[in-house]
Design a protein with these regions (language model features):
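Soluble cytosolic regulatory domains appended to membrane proteins
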Residues: 2-160
């Protein structure tokens, strides 16, 4: 058969293999999704800023933990003066561990004292490239910024 010359040939080969029962449906879909991801930008997959959950930096550990647990997310952006000023990421496990180990910290310490650095990515970045970077650097959540540096949204490795 020789080498495949382009993406279309590989897609056709996968379709043929699927039709003949050589490739499972989920594998077939995954291969097609890989090709489609190559043309996809981060802005198309992100959670837009209007749908984001965040914690204000001056909230107590108890308040931050309560909000994060109610949201169902394990990582939540922490904002300073507003949504365009993200100062880090709060991990529920960090907040919970601190609150359990030091009960007084629940009400005396602020969320901003327990944030991890945020990763920022441009909204016009290719999703496939970001996926590789997130996998390589073990990043689960990134802040998506628009061309003016404002917060456009967030993206998780699961979104990609």
């Amino acid at each position: 058969m020789g080498l495949l010359s382009d993406e279309d040939e590989l897609r056709q080969l996968m379709d043929h293999a699927h039709t003949r029962g050589l490739v499972e449906s989920d594998e077939h879909e995954m291969i097609h999704n890989v090709f489609e991801l190559g043309d996809t930008l981060v802005r198309e997959l992100m959670v837009p800023r209007t749908d984001m959950v965040w914690i204000e930096k001056d909230k107590t550990l108890r308040q931050g933990l309560s909000l994060a647990l109610r949201s169902g997310y394990s990582r939540v952006p922490v904002v300073g003066d507003g949504i365009d000023n993200i100062i880090g990421i709060a991990y529920v496990k960090d907040l919970a561990k601190r609150a359990l180990d030091h009960h007084e910290a629940e009400t005396t310490e602020k969320v901003e004292q327990h944030t991890r650095p945020a990763v920022f990515v441009p909204e016009n970045k290719e999703a496939a490239e970001l996926l590789k970077e997130m996998q390589r650097d073990q990043i689960h959540l990134a802040i998506v910024v628009d061309e003016y540096g404002g917060t456009a949204g967030i993206i998780t490795i699961e979104d990609i």
